[in-house]
Amino acid sequence: MRFTKMEGLGNDYVYVNCFREKVYDPEILARLVSDRHRGIGGDGLILIGSSARADFNMDIYNADGSRAEMCGNGIRCLGKYVYDHGMTEKTEFTVETQAGIKRLRCILQDGRVAAVCVDMGRPDIGAVVETAVLPDETVDFVRVSMGNPHAVVWVDDIYVCQMETLGPEMEAHPMFPNRTNVEFVQIVDEDHMRMRVWERGSGETFACGTGACAAVAAGIAAGRTRDSVKVSLLGGTLDIDYDRQNETMYMTGPAREVFEGWTDIY
C-alpha cells in the first residue's frame, strides 16, 4: 500500500489516496499505521476519495481506530496533497467530511501549497458554562461543536494545567456520550491565546484546528477575545477569523508533506 505522511503544525497523519488504493478495514489500518514504534507513526489515518457532493471526500480515523468527524490540520494537508499531486488545478475547492462540506483556498508559494485557508463553518456554542465532576476535582468548561465535540477549559497557564490527568478524564466523562476533545486555553490578550489539546482517540497532540476554532468561538462568546485571534499551539500558530455576517469561522495555517512510502503492514 502506498501512503504519504503529512503534518500541519505537528499534527501528523498517514494519507492514503483511495483513487488508486483499496482500503477494506480502515479502523484496523488506522491502529496499525499510527503506531509510532511498530507502524509508520501518526495521530491517525486519512483517506482521500471521491464525493458525489464535493470535489473530494475525506474520511478520518483516530490513532485508536475510532472515527472522527473533522480535523482542521488534516483537511489543510489534504488540500496540499490534492493540489501538489495534480489531482486538481483549482486553488479553491470543496471537501466532503462527516461534519459537512468544507471549502478550501490554497495559498501558493513557488507553485506549491504553503498554507491553506478553510471555511470551518458555524460554531455551535453551549448556552452556559458547565461543570464536570471528576474523581479529584470539578472543572468548568464551555461546550462547543465544530461538527465534532469540544470542551473548552480556561486556565491561567497551559503548562501547569494537569492535562495528562484532566484530559483523559474529561474525554471519557459521561457528559460526553461520544467522548470529546478537550482544549486547555490561556488568554494572553484580546488577539492572542495559547492552547494545549487532548484529542479524542489520540491523546495530546501538537495542534488541533477545530479545537482552535472552538476556543476562539468560546472566547468571543465570553467577550474575552476579538474576531481575529492568533492561537499558539505546541506545534505553531493558527490564524482564526470569525465572520459575523455569515457566522462562520475561518482557519489559516501551514501544511507540509513529510515523506511518501510503501508498506506491507496491511
Where are these regions (language model features)?
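A glycine-rich beta-to-alpha transition motif near the start of alpha/beta enzyme domains, typified by
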Residues: M1-R112, V152-Y266
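Internal active-site segments that recognize and position negatively charged phosphoryl groups
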Residues: V133-V160
